[in-house]
């Protein structure tokens, strides 16, 4: 199998994961059978019991931020279907992880608990709550927000793999009308 075909196939697999996770998360019901719920009623999740267990696990660990995981698979699918490649994988995936964790802490600090189909849960799941709580114990509320904001900004350097200020300046320079 050639490298081009392999990339397309991988792109289709990532797109399938996006669809499965997206539908599982959208049709999630906290009352479906799952790791911590016993139920005799029929599963409401459109992806069946596997979707129910998957969505419950993602919501418990990552909360609403779990939707970013699905969209990450969508991003990877477009990348591979268009036969592009991430040239520097380590910085890119480090940036993705740092972005996800810092955004989880920030959003958990700001939004706290949310109501999901009649059940209260942490916006960023157990992971976001534990990280936010740990940072707040060490640095206080302002320090936690500052540090997570700083890490969010740093993650953009890893993701874009280019100087951010320079990229912003180039973007604005192109949009200015030509002076006569």
Regions found by a protein language model. Give the residues of each.
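Alpha-helical transmembrane segments used as membrane anchors
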Residues: 1-180
């Amino acid at each position: 199998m050639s490298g081009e075909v392999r990339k397309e196939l991988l792109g289709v697999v990532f797109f399938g994961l996006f669809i499965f996770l997206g539908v599982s998360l959208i049709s999630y019901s906290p009352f479906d059978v799952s790791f911590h719920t016993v139920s005799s009623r029929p599963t409401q999740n459109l992806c069946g019991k596997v979707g129910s267990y998957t969505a419950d696990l993602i919501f418990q660990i990552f909360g609403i931020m779990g939707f970013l995981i699905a969209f990450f698979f969508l991003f990877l699918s477009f990348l591979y279907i268009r036969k592009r490649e991430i040239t520097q994988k380590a910085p890119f995936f480090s940036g993705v992880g740092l972005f996800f964790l810092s955004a989880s802490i920030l959003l958990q600090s700001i939004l706290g608990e949310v109501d999901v189909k009649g059940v209260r849960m942490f916006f960023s799941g157990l992971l976001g709550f534990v990280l936010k709580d740990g940072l707040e114990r060490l640095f206080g509320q302002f320090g936690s927000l500052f540090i997570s904001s700083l890490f969010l900004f740093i993650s953009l350097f890893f993701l874009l793999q280019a100087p951010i200020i320079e990229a912003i300046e180039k973007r604005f320079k192109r949009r200015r009308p030509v002076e006569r």
